[in-house]
Regions:
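Non-catalytic pre-domain segments flanking phosphatase-related domains
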Residues: 1-14, 32-36, 61, 191, ...
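Mg2+-dependent phosphoryl-transfer enzymes with acidic/Ser/Thr/Gly-rich catalytic loops
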Residues: 2-7, 27, 172, 179-260
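A general structural motif
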Residues: 7-9, 42, 68, 130, ...
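Hydrophobic "anchor" residues
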Residues: 19-20
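Active-site phosphate-binding/coordination module
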Residues: 28-124, 221
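Conserved acidic, metal-coordinating active-site core of Asp-based
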Residues: 108-199, 203-212
Length: 260
């Protein structure tokens, strides 16, 4: 891709844990660089996390990240505007975002299938909501995951299964993941995917990187499952630095920041 033909970045969608969060000085560096951008012209800032929406907003305050314009929570199953931001005023009612998840989905059935398996452990209630069933499953083989998919299908469910970090298993409605939620938001905002940059570190970020035309930043501490995506892909930048410093490095590469 010829750099000069790329459109300016209009939106940053970043994961939190292991990406913008995980190294306090790096997080602070990102915050100062972001806040130095002209508020009228800087990209829309979206935090796209497996955490639930309220938890994201509390966590952002806790670690000192800049306030987001929007949050996508629950691995693409929740969408919210932040607290006290006038930028939300022009945004249409968010409730219709979740209406698309109902078909083929039953939380009770999902929980029954996963709860019947011997190696799965239900994650705490703080990680669960109406369209996200989250479990711990250590070092699952592809065969074990395929077996779970079959069991869910046999129960009449139409779901997306996301396994990341060799531990975290999220069962979501078929039309839910971080990438699809981001694409929906961009469409509502009138922002093209070729004006978007995404950042992440694990497999549950993969769907963001797969959006056609979107640019990416894979931080140096990313798991192999995501690092492999960046090979031979000119739209995905592999940072040499980890955590938020890697995001800063990537934003220099994509011309959002002038320097690191």
């Amino acid at each position: 891709v010829e750099r000069r033909r790329l459109k300016p970045i209009a939106l940053l969608s970043s994961d939190l844990d292991g990406t913008l969060a995980g190294d306090a000085p790096a997080t602070s560096r990102f915050r100062s660089k972001w806040q130095a951008l002209d508020p009228e012209h800087r990209p829309v800032l979206v935090y796209n996390s497996g955490r639930l929406a309220d938890d994201i907003l509390n966590f952002v305050d806790e670690v000192g990240l800049p306030a987001p314009d929007y949050v996508i929570g629950g691995v693409g199953t929740m969408l919210a505007g932040p607290r006290h931001t006038p930028r939300l005023a022009h945004f249409p009612e968010l409730s219709h975002f979740a209406q698309r998840f109902s078909e083929g989905w039953s939380l009770d059935k999902v929980d029954a299938v996963l709860g019947s398996l011997k190696d799965t452990v239900r994650q705490p209630d703080g990680y669960q909501h109406a369209f996200k069933s989250s479990w711990y499953l250590l070092d699952a083989s592809p065969e074990a995951l395929a077996s779970i998919e079959r069991a869910l299908a046999e129960a009449g469910l139409s779901v997306t299964m996301v396994y990341s970090s060799g531990r975290d298993l999220d069962i979501l409605p078929r039309s839910a993941d971080k990438g699809q939620a981001l694409a929906w938001l961009c469409n509502e905002l009138g922002i093209g995917l070729d004006e978007v940059v995404v950042a992440g570190d694990t497999n549950n970020d993969r769907s963001m990187f797969e959006l056609p035309g979107a640019r990416g930043i894979v931080v140096a501490n990313a798991l192999p499952e995501l690092l492999d995506m960046a090979r031979d892909n000119s739209l995905i930048y592999s940072a040499k630095t980890p955590f938020a410093l890697g995001v800063v490095e990537g934003l220099v590469h994509w011309s959002v920041f002038a320097d690191a």
